Amino acid sequence: MRNMFADAPRTSLTAIYWAFLLYLLLPLTLMMAMSFRDANFVAFPIGDWTLDWYAKVMQDKQFLEACLYSVMIAAASTLAATTLGTWIAMLIVAEGIKGQVIIFALACLPAVVPGMISAISLRIFISTIDMPTGTAAIILGHTVHAVPFVVVMALTRLRSMPGNLVDAARDLGADSIVAFFRVTLPYLGPALVGGMIFCVLLSIDDFVRTFFLGGYRPTLPMLIFAKVQGGMSPEINAMATLVLVVTAAVGLYAEYMTRRARTR
């Protein structure tokens, strides 16, 4: 009896875990299953299965253009966020810099501000400086949102870096720039790769900032949102499934790179 009561918390936590996992995976599983339905509407039972919806999606010019546009924005914002985030991380760990805690707090602020508030404030900002909505504004918004993640990952890596590596490079005659590119940057490599992948995922998935800052060209989330307004269909499920598979693969690779950065 005593053992039964002792195991009760563990059993409850296990049940909660599996219930939560089911809550997360069941909608995704249903979405993927519906993408194979051989009909123009979503309903149970699925009936006949087909790959026609995937073929239609891959021939959809709007979908392909939205994918390319999303990738372009993700690449630009990732490059900007990685450069800025790395510089901020090095500023935080540098000697003789005052207010490092404040710098870190301000750098991480975009990650905790609600997306709606961030989008509205950015829209007000670009209106103030007479910057038109569109590609540049979207890249700015995605960069601001992604910088904190690069800062945290780069900072974690920098704090584990032996200080004698840079000192040894300087003793051998390297200046600060050469030491950075020959020593610091290679050491930061795994963390930066993981941070860049997270930036790509954040950018491709970002809907709120894109909605407020975008122009007439739709990104992938905007296109799917527009299609959903006309009702759910297996075509939309096929689009979402393709995005899910790609982002899941990229996310798993990012997790691998993060673990590698922590263990090296």
Descriptions of predicted regions:
Residues 64, 68, 72-84, 88, ...:
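Hydrophobic alpha-helical transmembrane segments of multipass integral membrane proteins
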Residues 3-9, 39, 54-62, 204-255:
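Interhelical loop and adjacent transmembrane-helix boundary motif
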Residues 65-72, 121-150, 189-191, 196, ...:
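Loop-to-helix entry region at the N-terminal start of transmembrane alpha-helices
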Residues 2-15, 155-170, 176-185, 237-264:
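C-terminal transmembrane helix and the adjacent membrane-cytosol boundary/short C-terminal tail
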Residues 40-77, 229-230:
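Periplasmic/extracellular loop-to-transmembrane helix junction in inner-membrane transport proteins
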Residues 16, 23-28, 143-144, 151-157, ...:
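Transmembrane alpha-helices
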Residues 3, 42, 46, 51, ...:
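Membrane-interfacial helix termini and adjacent extracytoplasmic/periplasmic loops
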Residues 1-8, 75-107, 124, 163-164, ...:
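Transmembrane-helix boundary motif in ABC transporter permease subunits
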